[in-house]
């Protein structure tokens, strides 16, 4: 029979610490990609409204009385739906401009925020506490550890393969194109990778802010702006 100390440490604390580590890595990596994509040092993973879509879906699941796995699944669906909605709306007449992408994300995030406020206002008191707890961040176990770590490592390996192109893109779009980088394809790839990382992080732990904004800058202060170091460091 397992002792209480063993159960607390290895079945409760360590899995949650591992979840926090993986979620922090996802948000840090998504923050780096988002700052490159938008060419804005103040960009963070939530600027495109992905977390807002996840929050609306998760709160509706809580309101319907779903269990934790169902809530996480609803958050994943909401995050992915929000990501694709931003992508479609930001294309305009076939063009995919960074400014339009940013404005579309900000507007959609504001709209999701209003819906979240409405849900909290009309929900019964019995559900409000659980909703607020999810919005603040919840790292309870919902997915096997190998899935969480696999998502992070796969995304990191893919992003690391484009580190040279990211270095060139950070110098300017015209210069990157003159050196052979397909900037349109690269930006679309950055958008979907950052969106999927953010959706995964929100699904695992709810909306945890600040990490994706600050961590990339901390890594740059310590190791410079070379994305061969910034990506794994974040």
Give the positions of each predicted feature.
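Alpha-helical transmembrane segments in inner-membrane proteins
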Residues: 1-234
